[in-house]
């Protein structure tokens, strides 16, 4: 009986043997889209055998993902995260329903039960909807966002406290990249309030969602900056905090500013 590591190594070898000729043929016939096949197969392999790696990649890529609706006006699809979310959801549901690999504390948690009720109600209303296909698509979208971001991450967080720090670092690093991109574009227009509504495009649709994400992750950057750690990690976290501070101010999102003031007030109450 082969172990998981042996099976995964065998599949990696098969992927390599299949993709090498494809790359050669794509060069010979100048069919450049074939170069997308190797990373696509690697993503499938990673999702099947290392669900944690796949989830960390999704977390890392989320702040810099691009929505095709914004660029083409077609079907809404965020790349590269959304196809992976679908794969992770499929594997996670199999592990939850058939293999029982998820912590029962997550499955039976009151928030989880509330989610089950919410999705069941969505299914009922989708069936009775005037446009059932549209409603079912909306339900499917909800499922492939909720399962990875709630159930899979909760499983990883319960598995190890280090995973919580991994999540914060991965998300904040690319959020800082997105903030730098926005600041550079914004600087070309003199940091005016009028242009602040769209300079974060295509990473964020407009400044409201951009400011909301900055405000939500600002306390995390603050925590990483002042937690007991090596000076190198604290210095990097401090640099990210400075960039996110500037980005939050120049987002001209009053709701984000007020939420940070409110969060600070709550912190002082419990200090």
For each feature predicted by the language model, list its residue ranges:
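Alpha-helical transmembrane segments of multi-pass inner-membrane proteins
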Residues: 1-23, 39-43, 89, 116-127, ...
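N-terminal signal-anchor transmembrane segment
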Residues: 7-95, 124-128
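Membrane-interface micro-motifs in multi-pass membrane enzymes
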Residues: 29-33, 75-84, 138-142, 202-216, ...
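Membrane-interface helix-loop-helix junctions at transmembrane boundaries of multi-pass membrane enzymes
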Residues: 47, 51-53, 94-114, 224-239, ...
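Cytoplasmic-side transmembrane-helix entry/capping segments in multi-pass membrane proteins
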Residues: 59-61, 106-116, 168-172
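Aromatic-anchored transmembrane helix interface
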Residues: 81-87, 110-121, 132-156, 175, ...
């Amino acid at each position: 009986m082969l172990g998981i590591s042996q099976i995964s190594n065998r599949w990696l070898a098969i992927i390599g043997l299949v993709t090498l000729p494809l790359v050669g043929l794509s060069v010979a016939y100048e069919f450049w889209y074939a170069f997308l096949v190797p990373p696509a197969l690697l993503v499938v392999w990673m999702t099947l055998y290392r669900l944690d790696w796949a989830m960390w990649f999704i977390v890392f890529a989320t702040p810099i993902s691009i929505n095709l609706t914004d660029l083409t006006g077609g079907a809404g699809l965020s790349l590269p995260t959304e196809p992976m979310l679908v794969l992770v959801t499929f594997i996670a549901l199999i592990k939850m329903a058939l293999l029982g690999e998820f912590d029962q504390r997550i499955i039976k948690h009151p928030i989880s039960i509330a989610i089950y009720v919410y999705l069941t109600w969505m299914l009922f209303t989708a069936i009775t909807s005037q446009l059932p296909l549209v409603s079912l698509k909306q339900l499917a979208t909800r499922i492939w966002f909720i399962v990875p971001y709630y159930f899979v991450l909760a499983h990883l967080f319960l598995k190890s406290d280090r995973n919580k720090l991994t999540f914060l670092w991965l998300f904040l690093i690319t959020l800082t990249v997105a903030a730098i991109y926005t600041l550079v574009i914004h600087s070309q227009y003199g940091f005016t309030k009028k242009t602040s509504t769209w300079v974060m495009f295509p990473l964020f649709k407009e400044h409201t969602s951009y400011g909301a994400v900055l405000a939500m992750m600002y306390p995390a950057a603050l925590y990483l900056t002042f937690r007991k750690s090596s000076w190198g990690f604290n210095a990097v976290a401090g640099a990210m905090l400075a960039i996110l501070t500037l980005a939050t101010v120049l987002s001209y999102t009053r709701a984000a500013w007020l939420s940070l003031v409110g969060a600070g007030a709550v912190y002082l109450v419990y200090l």
